[in-house]
Amino acid sequence: MAHHARWTLSQVTELFDKPLLDLLFEAQTIHRQHFDPRQVQVSTLLSIKTGACPEDCKYCPQSSRYKTGLETERLMEVEQVLDSARKAKNAGSTRFCMGAAWKNPHERDMPYLEQMVQGVKAMGLEACMTLGTLDETQAQRLASAGLDYYNHNLDTSPEFYGNIITTRTYQERLDTLDKVRDAGIKVCSGGIVGLGETVKDRAGLLLQLANLPTPPESVPINMLVKVKGTPLADNDDVDAFDFIRTIAVARIMMPTSFVRLSAGREQMNEQTQAMCFMAGANSIFYGCKLLTTPNPEEDKDVQLFRKLGLNPQQTDVMTGDNEQQQKLEEQIFNADTDQFYNAAAL
């Protein structure tokens, strides 16, 4: 379905109800119409300001409301961030994402954030940030600095959202996505599976994303990472097939978006990850940690790519000499290197 045709909840729930193999076949068919099925986009995520967040997101160890043992850190120095970006590039990432545990960035932080974006872009990497809600001026300033992507997840359906977060409204999240889009920055927005939501809620989340005026260019689908001290620490595990279904439905509904395996990949075995790629996932976060949760060791990713015959995707902002593509391909096929352990200095 073209993205200008609005989906209905009944259409989405019908997709979730399909026999799994039929759903995977449909998703993979659509995926191949828009993407090279062997290409996977590789991103690295760095927490540039950790913990002490005033929000009450029940899944998040960075909230100041929960005792999770997380060490809080102030905003990193610009050069520290750029050093991590260099390591990520050397390890083969094509996009560098910077995350700060804020409700929203303060004016005093904006010059440093702009310098980070400019420095990352100067390396030939795509730059992405996730900083909480933005106003129009902040979005414009980040766009002027060269920011490619802004991440702001919807997390779940509007109906279930109030069970998870009370300090920021669903509409505030949608408003931030509008401001980012209006500033000319690409949108990265997805959600989390395993919050205690129903299949109808998963359908509702994807409905919101797919029915945006322009669907997000990047859609991260996270599996809840249960962190001791957070209210969701004792939630039931997510069934792997339910997660794979969510990936497949996202691919069908948003055929031209990158669908990213994000948090929770540490909990997935190789077979589950392979089925996610079959379902249409074509982007991963690659590095030691995803903000404050574990990510599979990088050499395991290298080995999995090699087993599945997958290749890292070249970034759009490269200068033309293919140096970065060659670096990652060399390491994919010579996986005895330890450079990947330095992909994200968190």
From Swiss-Prot:
[2Fe-2S] cluster binds at C97, C128, C188, R260. Residues 38-256 form the Radical SAM core domain. It is an enzyme of class 2 (transferase). Binds 1 [4Fe-4S] cluster. The cluster is coordinated with 3 cysteines and an exchangeable S-adenosyl-L-methionine. Binds 1 [2Fe-2S] cluster. The cluster is coordinated with 3 cysteines and 1 arginine. Pfam families: BATS, Radical_SAM. Pathway: Cofactor biosynthesis; biotin biosynthesis; biotin from 7,8-diaminononanoate: step 2/2. GO terms for molecular function: 2 iron, 2 sulfur cluster binding; 4 iron, 4 sulfur cluster binding; biotin synthase activity; iron ion binding. HAMAP family: BioB. This is Biotin synthase. It comes from Pseudescherichia vulneris (Escherichia vulneris). The lineage of its organism: Bacteria, Pseudomonadati, Pseudomonadota, Gammaproteobacteria, Enterobacterales.
